[in-house]
Amino acid sequence: MKKAFGQTVRDLKRGVNKKVLKVPGIEQKVLDATSNESWGPHGSLLADIAHASRNYHEYQITMGVLWKRLSDSGKNWRHVYKALTVLEYMVGHGSERVIEEVKEHAYQITTLSGFQYIDSSGKDQGSNVRKKAQSLVALVNDKERITEVREKAAANRDKYHNSMHRPSGGYGDKYDYEGRYGDRDEGRSSYGKEREYGYRDDDRNSRDGDRYSRDSEDRYGRDGNTDDEYRGRSRSVDNYNGSRGRSSDRERPIEDDGQSSSRDSGAPADDHSQDGRGGLERKFSEQNIGAAPPSYEEAVSESRSPVYSERDGGETPQVAPPGAAASPLAENISVDNKAADFVNESSPQQVEAFDEFDPRGSVSAACAPTAGASVPAPIPPTVVSTPAPPASINAEMDLLGSLSDVFSPNPLAIVTSDSTSVETNGQANTGLAPSFSTSQSSTQPFDDPFGDSPFKAITSADTETSQHQSFGVPFQPTPPTSNPNNEHNFGFGEAFSAVTDSEPGVQNMQAPPNLSVFPQEQFDTSQSEIDILAGILPPSGPPVSLSPQPDSTMPTSQFHPNGNSYESYHHQAAPTDLNMQGQTPFGQASQQFNMVSHSQNHHEGMQFNNGGFTQQPGYAGPATSQPPQYTPGVSSHPPSESFPHQPGSATSASSQTPYATTPNVSAGQFDGGSFMTQQPYGVTQQVHVVPSHIPQRTQSGPVAAFGNNNNIVGDMHQPGSTPSSSSQTPYPTTPNAPSGQFDGGNFMTQQPYGVIPQVHGVPSHIPQRTQSGPVAAHGNSNNVVGDMFSPAGLSSLETSASQPSLTPLTGAIEIVPQNQKKFEPKSTIWADTLSRGLVNFNISGPKTNPLADIGVDFEAINRKEKRLEKPTITQQQVTSTINMGKAMGSGTGLGRAGAGAMRPPTNSMVGSSMPTGMNVGGYGGMNQHQPIGMNQNHPMGMNQNLSMGMNQNYPMGMNQNYPMGMGMNMNMGGYGQGYPMQPQQGMGMAPPGAPQGMTGAYNPMMGQGGYNPQQQQPYGGGYR
């Protein structure tokens, strides 16, 4: 009686502990089966453990407990013996994976053959362990015996299945190819049905769910109708054919494991597909016969960026957008934009995306065909499998996630063609842009590494036609002939998406010169539905190739075929007009990076060490520039596209040229993808350094604000300059300039004379607008920082580089001196507390001093201590703040309590969350006149191309060639990346908390968000 009572108490105690400690159910069962009780493991526990071995996670828990039990010794010999018993049972009844693991641990089991333990009664209990260990090792080494044992176990299950204990659920056995246990639960009672459903559905999306779920419907399914009711779909949807192609002779119910396997698409049954989709999603899978099955991500996202996988150079199934039918290669394809409207974002098309970590292949989605199909006309989605040339750019996810396609937010309507001619008839209005037709031969969309597409820009020609003005005569550029052999993979997956062909003379794109003024309402229409992260997260779609200027000839884009992302890229053009825009490796006009003025005679050309390119035009003549037009299907948003907005109508044609005509410029040297000019005279510059993917609009007329919500930082610089159009020249007119040098991705002008530089440095992905006329206010709600610099009428950055006065900022953001906040160390707090009497250590003591008679005077001692303490406190207030204070840092090492307690510099700076890589007035990036603690040839600014995964040799921006991973907008750069590397730390160290993978307005000093001048640290030293 006492023994039974003690056993009951132990059981209760064990049960309470397991509940309190939240031990998993399977672990409880294994512990119970291998307990120290004097009886063997219960059959129901063994059955549950064997079934759980088919669940990956439960299998791991089970085996972990068993191997730990096998390591016991001495009086815990029952742990060892029972663990061997459980293993032996699992070899016959559980997953075959157990057999493999037992073989791997055979050495451990073999050592148990010498297990010794003699209990208090003198009985050799170790013999039981020795015999069991020997029998288990012999079993796992005998394949025939294993087969016999497993077949016998299967027969027993079929014979006694009515009395069989309910399994705890789990997945199918990937090793159980013969379907031996398929009939396990055919007539099982209803005990535990609902519980099993809930349990298994919780785990069906687990890590290896698809691997171990092949036979779950054979084992644990009961009734197809019950299954279908639970799944919420009818059996006719799956076209269930009643057999899985294995040894089962009856129809098995549909698994409730998140799978419809490969029955839908006709693929072999052994393809462990995870195709639990319905409706249109399944239709894509059914059409996708020869392709790898889509991933689970498709079941949860309806509109995701499409992606391709051309690793094997095989067939790439493609679904044309609902506004485009995939057709064979055509020589001349005429696309009526008004009819097709490129179906743009307005079509509620479901696009299955592809898991970037799923290695199984491509997904049928609406995306741009590779160099083997063209998409000309609107019909419902059609799957076309076209052999993708192995030489084409792999549209695989690179680590930085489709960098070049960050700014083509139209994932649905992508019109790429490898035909020799494409005519664009009409104009499809897409929210923010005029029509533009181009051929991007080797651009492919990318996957979205952050989940769903950041936005759905829903616009259509019906709603937008009344809001936009035409640019005049639509032009028909002659696209370059596609040559898939010249497509390159640049080191970052497809970081450079707009790759032009290396055939000379194929980009002679000419447009009619009669163009109207850049329409004001072109940017009035705000796409309020566009996410604020639209410029950060990479929606799929190739960036636009910019339209040529009127009467200009596109220079030949010659690309070195080695595919090196840092290879020099030369645009060598015949004498043409100066508005030359060629496709660059960054998917934008070559003018963006050709910061040095077009010269009539480049002596040494422009030298690019790092990912730059050289454009050597022969003659830079005046021309009335045209605002680049781009196709709505190719890209959607000017603020997120890469093209310079150039004024349509100009007072003076020559003054409106974005690149001043330079008679003789010796050399512009690009070292890190940045730009620096050396001007020997007093030239008033307005240098707009436009790194990758920055829309730059220079206009002389009144212009409305960018109306889209991508404009995070707003128009960074809106100087109210003089109305003369000569001030609109974004690049300086330099009669004779020595070589400009770029060191480490910064912009630095060395001006020997009185030059008033007006530098508007903008890192990647920031809209820049320089206007001389009145500027309309931003109409969007996502303009985080607003117009940082005042529009016309306010003194803007035009004089910020030459005078240290504060610049009035829109939104009442002003840089005000911060009061030096006194930091009080702990000793001061204690002294103050004690002096105020807030803490009385003599709470319970007597009022009179009991030791007064022996000469102990506590008051005198206290007074003496306070006198000694006060000088120390005063000294600590001066010197000891190096290691006290702020929560995250050690101060600056300069006797200051941290950056927040210092007065920021008086010259204008752009601020924390405004990632203007080349700030004005020498706060970071440009350091025109105040290169504090920095070499002028090595200004720290932002590596212009760094945000796109380029120029990784200079990630520090200091030209030290040490990629220390300081994350200066390396992570796909986005609006408000802030300064992950604080601008004027002499070391160029990154704050320790700047995550590399974080995009968005991250600032290591103040998190994500707006501008706070207190967070600047003007001194080199410690980082917060």
From Swiss-Prot:
SUPFAM superfamilies linked: ENTH/VHS domain
Keywords of this entry: Cytoplasmic vesicle, Golgi apparatus, Phosphoprotein, Protein transport, Transport
Gene for this chain: EPSIN3
Main location: Golgi
CDD domains registered for this protein in UniProt: ENTH (cd03571)
Region feature (Disordered): 152-327, 419-492, 538-565, 602-670, 712-739, 884-910
Position of sequence motif Clathrin binding: 403-407
Family: Belongs to the epsin family.
Basic and acidic residues bias spans: 152-161, 173-236, 246-255, 269-285
Organism: Arabidopsis thaliana
Protein known as: Clathrin interactor EPSIN 3
GO annotation, biological process: protein transport
